[in-house]
Design a protein with these regions (language model features):
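Cytochrome P450 catalytic-core helices
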Residues: 98, 102
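Active-site region of chymotrypsin-like
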Residues: 68-84, 187-196, 226-328
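N-terminal activation segment of mature serine protease catalytic domains
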Residues: 8, 12-90, 103, 178-182
């Protein structure tokens, strides 16, 4: 099993471009099976490129895990003054400019888990001001050590749906999603380019082999405060792969609501533990993203994914869709084209 990984850079005239394209083999670590496993830490040899900066060359060298952690990241939430950083899901980079995708319900975890609130502000969603949400990116191990990370806060978030008013006095209104997909924007990368995964506009097919990659059951991270700065304690950040086959596709679920996952979605028979919500689901033999992990049935190999293709047509921050951004090239959104992709 492998994933097709691109390495992006910004040209001297400010255009995003792919500098490298390489397959990464995903092998189980010792003691794991082939349908659910922690990724073995194979070393990936660098591919030289004359226009690379030193930092980019460092990023192009390392283990399979270090490569993937540039593109697949844990979603975290910090409540002001709390003693730990909550790990609430997984996200993945979809543009070199700093767009990341996750499951929409991950962003409402503060409301659902009772440590924060989402407020109806004239039909828009506003979160409590004492909560910071974002993702963690690895820093180059040669300069900062093997487990150093950088917190990248969400600057803005976009999901699709509206407020559903509860008829019961004791229940709060809540967001009713059109699809379980959300896109968040980060500040520009300090080193030039984020490293996105390849997207597909094609729907997944029944009986297609797919696999999700995410931070299964990752523990919350202890924090302490030094001169007003947040310092993270020791933590483990391990990526897991869960392999399955699609069993049903619900393209018209927005109208029929035949399953509880909102919007166009599909079912697949894979083990999906907690904290993998928002993980990318890959198909096309690992070349492209087909969907986003939405939910799973506890203790069973039965999960649901939100389809990526239909979500690419929805309006984003400036009313342009993800498909529009693919065509323009202004954000560095990758799309790999070919038979079956």
């Amino acid at each position: 099993m492998e994933i097709l990984k691109t390495l992006w850079e910004k040209s001297s005239v400010g255009e995003w471009k792919i500098a490298q394209l390489r397959p990464l083999k995903l092998l189980p670590a010792q003691g794991y099976g082939e349908d659910y496993f922690w990724i073995a830490n194979r070393f990936e040899f660098p591919t030289t490129h004359r226009s690379f900066s030193f930092g980019q060359l460092v990023e192009s060298t390392g283990s399979t895990n270090s490569f993937l952690k540039q593109s697949i990241v844990p979603v975290v939430a910090l409540v002001a003054g709390a003693s730990f950083l909550r790990v609430i899901g997984t996200a993945f980079v979809i543009s070199a400019s700093g767009l990341v995708m996750t499951a929409a319900h991950v962003l409402l975890d503060p409301e659902d888990s009772g440590y924060g609130g989402a407020i109806n502000e004239n039909g828009a969603v506003r979160f409590d001001g004492n909560i910071q949400m974002g993702v963690l990116f690895p820093l180059p191990s040669t300069s900062y050590g093997p487990s150093a990370v950088r917190f990248a806060p969400f600057q803005s978030s976009r999901f699709w749906g509206g407020w559903k008013e509860s008829p019961l006095f004791h229940e709060r209104d809540r967001v009713d999603f059109d699809t379980d997909v959300a896109i968040c924007r980060l500040l520009p990368h300090p080193g030039g380019a984020y490293q996105p995964l390849n997207l597909s506009l094609r729907p997944v097919e029944v009986s297609e082999q797919v696999f999700a990659i995410g931070y299964a059951e990752m523990d919350d991270i202890p924090v302490r405060y030094v001169d007003g700065a947040v310092v993270l304690g020791q933590f483990s950040q391990d990526l897991y792969v869960s392999v399955g086959t699609t069993t049903a596709v619900h393209l018209d679920n927005a109208q029929t609501r035949s399953v509880s996952t909102p919007g166009p979605c599909f079912e697949f028979d894979a083990r999906i533990p907690g904290k993998m919500s928002g993980s990318p689901i890959l198909g096309g033999d690992g070349a492209v993203i087909r969907g986003v992990v939405s939910k799973s049935l506890s203790g069973e190999r039965h999960a649901f994914g939100a389809l990526l293709g239909p979500a690419t047509h929805l309006p984003l921050f400036d009313q342009e869709s993800l498909k529009d951004l693919m065509a323009k090239g202004s954000e560095g959104v990758p799309r790999i084209q070919g038979t079956g992709l």
